[in-house]
Regions:
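Active-site neighborhoods and metal-handling regions in enzymes and metal-associated proteins
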Residues: 1-186
């Protein structure tokens, strides 16, 4: 969705017109040999982020990068009983510390597999071989501003393998791609 629709978790109508100054949030799934992927990216319609959009985007990106570094066997995607080991609760705290409390409206991620939102027991710690997303986001409907960055991962003994790392998500890479058509080497 674009504009205020970028603040809706799963905007499906696709009827809004893209307007310069707005963001467009794309949440897409794919399937390969019966296994699913789920990826979200947020792009500035004009090709360049406004200062406010950039600030919000960078907060979301920093949360995702922190979760990527922290994710390891024994952590949880979400678990209210083990908040210090819960990636979701870590994201909530980081957003609160950034002054964005209450603007993160969904879980930090979900399991992937034969379904895009695959079954998984969130009360059991993550273990090597688990496939899941990390998708922090912030949503400000009053500003027509929604940002979500979602990537797919496999957990190993040593941390994460990002299956979607070739998709640009750094601000400079996105702006170069949109304004100059420059592809970035992954």
């Amino acid at each position: 969705g674009t504009g205020v629709n970028s603040t809706k978790l799963h905007y499906t109508q696709g009827a809004a017109q893209l307007t310069g100054g707005d963001l467009v949030l794309i949440d897409c799934g794919a399937e390969y040999e019966m296994y699913c992927a789920d990826v979200s990216r947020t792009y500035p319609v004009s090709g360049m982020f406004t200062p406010r959009q950039r600030d919000v985007y960078e907060i979301v990106l920093q949360v995702q990068k922190t979760l990527e570094r922290l994710a390891r066997p024994g952590m949880f995607l979400r678990n209210s009983e083990a908040q210090d080991a819960s990636l979701h609760h870590i994201a909530v705290r980081m957003f609160k510390d950034a002054g964005a409390e209450g603007h993160f409206k969904h879980s930090v991620g979900h399991f992937l597999g034969l379904d895009v939102h695959d079954v998984g027991d969130y009360s059991i710690p993550l273990s090597p071989g688990d496939a899941f997303t990390l998708e922090p986001g912030l949503y400000f409907p009053e500003e027509r501003l929604g940002v979500r960055i979602e990537d797919d991962y496999i957990l190993t003994e040593d941390g994460l393998i990002c299956l979607t790392e070739s998709l640009p998500k750094e601000v400079e890479d996105i702006e170069n791609l949109l304004t100059h058509g420059e592809e970035i080497e992954a």
